[in-house]
């Protein structure tokens, strides 16, 4: 058996640009035969600012993930915690897989730091993947600070120049990932996704399987 996993998903619960609440997201992915979703809501100064306590900011960020997580058994879809972080020095976005709630609470003002600092903090326990590196306004980051590149962002509402991301991946030793950059129901891809040979039981296993390349990227 093989398992479809969404690698890039935003909820209306936590991301202002999201158009669909967590439960409706799970319903839609169940209808499209997915087995897992990595919730990667936006985590940035633009979204959360610095006028609230860090605890309240993290609470708000985690809302979409937690609302989805408690519905896992109802929809038979595994939910994994991730994020799409943007620092204040550029418009680049980075998907981070494997993070824990504790990590977020302990590292105050994480999005006010830098990619280099995040790499140090991750201690190779998490995966840092540059999302849509060739979308307008984005530039390819220092490859030494990345674990992977999103080589196929299938969002129908943005031009991501995936061919350039794929070429950059081919010239590197980085991990390739794929995701629909979900914001609305029409984003879900029926033909392009990450397909795992086994369903990761938790975030740690998800990271391990991706590092070991125990998945393939399905394309049209």
What residue spans do the PLM features occupy?
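Charged catalytic cores and adjacent phosphate/nucleic-acid-binding surfaces used
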Residues: 1-7, 11, 15, 21-27, ...
């Amino acid at each position: 058996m093989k398992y479809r996993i969404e690698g890039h998903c935003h909820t209306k619960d936590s991301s202002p640009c999201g158009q669909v609440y967590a439960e409706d997201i799970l319903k839609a992915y169940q209808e499209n035969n997915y087995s897992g979703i990595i919730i990667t809501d936006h985590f940035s100064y633009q979204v959360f600012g610095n006028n609230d306590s860090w605890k309240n900011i993290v609470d708000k960020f985690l809302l979409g993930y937690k609302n989805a997580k408690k519905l896992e058994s109802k929809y038979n879809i595994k939910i994994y915690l991730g994020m799409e972080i943007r620092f204040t020095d550029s418009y680049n976005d980075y998907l981070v897989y494997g993070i824990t709630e504790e990590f977020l609470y302990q590292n105050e003002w994480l999005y006010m730091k830098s990619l280099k600092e995040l790499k140090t903090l991750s201690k190779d326990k998490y995966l840092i993947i540059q999302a849509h590196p060739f979308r307008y306004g984005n530039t390819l980051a220092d490859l030494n600070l990345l674990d992977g590149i999103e080589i196929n962002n299938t969002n129908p509402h943005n031009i991501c120049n995936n061919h350039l991301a794929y070429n950059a991946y081919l010239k590197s030793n980085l991990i390739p990932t794929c995701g629909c950059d979900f914001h609305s129901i029409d984003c879900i891809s029926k033909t392009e996704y990450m397909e795992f040979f086994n369903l990761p039981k938790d975030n740690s296993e998800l990271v391990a399987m991706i590092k070991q390349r125990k998945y393939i990227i399905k394309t049209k």
